[in-house]
């Protein structure tokens, strides 16, 4: 009886911890998105310099990552040759810098709610690029689902009250670069047995991003910042914003480490709906019924996609267990046969 109660208490504690990690990740992801919107939007803080903001984040995060790995030794650095770094990490850093630059730029032109709706295209982009790079197998059923997600997002875009073509182009570009980055991580790193958690990712990738972003920054934003009072650095705003960005990476580390990547995907859907509600109720962005209908269709498609991924993972785990039990049975049979032969020899 006591053992059963202890077991149930342990399960309850694990469930509470899992929900706590999910809540922390949703809160921090929510905060970073709204904070970035506040800084970049011309109607709010009015500091429309997305490259500079991204560089501040990368500089802060890479510095803290070095301290956590080299000084406090929170996690071990991954052993990596210079050639592997240049061929694998640098291309990923280039794509990440482009993705962050474009996604932050989109906040200047689009509402938070509409950006979240456009982000629903991420599974479509990841699957399509995966098929093109031969990392995913083409399946007509999966592609039909991807088309339904795209159709839902198209309806949401059609119903957008403050549609901005340039903003949509920036956000779609960010989705495309991010999807390519995710696929390349599998091809260039995971396939080679190199697994980077969010802290080691920042340690290796953030300095790359800083270097790549400095090139467009010198020509696009630096001249404007130099010639205006916008060059004044607000330590409170940018300091707290950078802390939130780094804390979000730690939250991803905790969430994926203690639960799973699929849990993060499901939590991401909840976060998107909360952001849409916040954008409509607090920021007073216009959310039309056509917006919601289109995003609802895309949401169902994304939900079905996540369900299929979960079923595939379960089937894979079950197959591994069957294989393991077969191997164990084979070893037992071999042991019995060898024991029988020994007995025959002794007789």
From Swiss-Prot:
Q: Which UniProt keywords apply?
A: Membrane, Phosphoprotein, Sugar transport, Transmembrane, Transmembrane helix, Transport
Q: Where located?
A: Membrane
Does the UniProt entry include the keyword Phosphoprotein? yes
Please tell me one Gene Ontology term that the record gives under cellular component: vacuole
For this protein, the record's InterPro entries field holds: Sugar_P_trans_dom (IPR004853), TPT_transporter (IPR050186)
- Residue positions where Phosphoserine is found in the record: 325
- Please list the residue ranges annotated as the EamA domain: 38-155
Residue spans crossing the bilayer: 15-35, 49-69, 89-109, 112-132, 143-163, 165-185, 205-225, 235-255, 263-283, 286-306
Annotated membrane topology is: Multi-pass membrane protein
Q: Does the keyword Kinase apply?
A: no
SUPFAM superfamilies, per database record: Multidrug resistance efflux transporter EmrE
Q: What is stated as this protein's family in its record?
A: Belongs to the TPT transporter family. TPT (TC 2.A.7.9) subfamily.
The protein's name in its UniProt record:
Probable sugar phosphate/phosphate translocator At2g25520
Identify the species of origin. Arabidopsis thaliana (Mouse-ear cress)
> Where is the organism placed in the taxonomic lineage, from the top?
Eukaryota, Viridiplantae, Streptophyta, Embryophyta, Tracheophyta
């Amino acid at each position: 009886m006591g053992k059963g109660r202890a077991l149930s208490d342990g399960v309850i504690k694990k469930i509470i911890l899992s929900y706590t990690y999910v809540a922390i990740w949703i809160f921090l992801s929510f905060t970073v998105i709204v904070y970035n919107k506040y800084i970049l939007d011309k109607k709010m803080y009015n500091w429309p310099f997305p490259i500079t903001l991204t560089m501040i984040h990368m500089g802060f995060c890479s510095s803290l990552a070095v301290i956590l790995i080299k000084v406090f030794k929170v996690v071990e650095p991954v052993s990596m040759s210079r050639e592997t770094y240049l061929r694998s990490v640098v291309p990923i850093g280039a794509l990440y810098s482009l993705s962050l630059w474009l996604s932050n730029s989109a906040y200047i032109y689009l509402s938070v709610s509409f950006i979240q709706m456009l982000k629903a295209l991420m599974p479509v982009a990841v699957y399509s690029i995966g098929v093109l790079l031969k990392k995913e197998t083409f399946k007509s059923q999966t592609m039909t689902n991807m088309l339904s997600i795209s159709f839902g997002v198209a309806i949401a875009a059609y119903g957008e009250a403050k549609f901005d073509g340039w903003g949509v182009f920036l956000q779609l570009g960010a989705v495309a670069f991010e999807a390519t980055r995710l696929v390349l991580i599998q091809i260039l790193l995971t396939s080679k047995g190199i697994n980077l958690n969010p802290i080691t990712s920042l340690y290796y990738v953030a300095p790359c991003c800083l270097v790549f972003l400095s090139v467009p920054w010198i020509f696009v934003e630096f001249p404007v910042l130099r010639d205006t009072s916008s060059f004044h650095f607000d330590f409170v705003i940018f300091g707290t914003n950078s802390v939130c960005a780094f804390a979000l990476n730690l939250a991803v580390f905790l969430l994926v480490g203690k639960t799973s990547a699929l849990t993060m995907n499901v939590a991401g859907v909840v976060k998107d709906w909360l952001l849409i509600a916040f954008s409509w109720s607090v920021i007073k962005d216009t959310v039309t019924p056509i917006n919601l209908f289109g995003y609802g269709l895309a949401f169902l498609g994304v939900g079905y996609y996540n369900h299929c991924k979960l079923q595939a993972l379960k089937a894979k785990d079950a197959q591994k267990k069957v294989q393991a039990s077969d191997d164990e049975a084979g070893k037992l049979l071999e042991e019995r046969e060898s024991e029988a032969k020994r007995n025959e020899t002794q007789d």
